[in-house]
Amino acid sequence: SELLTPLVNGLAPHVDLWLAETQSSIAEARAIHAGLPKDGKPFWLSFTLKDEDTDEVPRLRSGEPVADAAEAAAQLGVQVLLFNCSQPEVIGAAIDAARATFERLGAAIQIGAYANAFPPQPKEATANDGLDPLRDDLDPPGYLHWAADWQARGASHLGGCCGIGPEHIAV
């Protein structure tokens, strides 16, 4: 709240919607939501996913199941739930889990995705400890393959995160 309040107060007169981006846990999303003004502006929420050691259940970086995150998003009144800054390979299952949760709840929440182009990060990696290479297979046609899959699974908002540029979006 000490860090969030001045940011929100400064941005409030200038934004059309609120986006809590690259959240790694449900608690983070709830904390951001609690710090937003009750101004009627749409609230979009984007989670980052666990890329490594995945089991059959898509998970946030915190280890929480995406289905639980989707249920929390519905409770928070989110208009769009997105998945970003993750490997494209894990996003499809997250979309499926979110869509199934929203259908079960009868929630009309849109879904979106925007992956990054970095190779998988080791568990011991730290933020900003160097430059990451970009994956060769995620050139514009390679990224289009993933975006088409996400759209087929029900994503209506598509974009790109780190390493995905305008040339990717143009295709």
Which residue ranges define each predicted feature?
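Domain-level signal for soluble alpha/beta catalytic cores
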Residues: 1-171
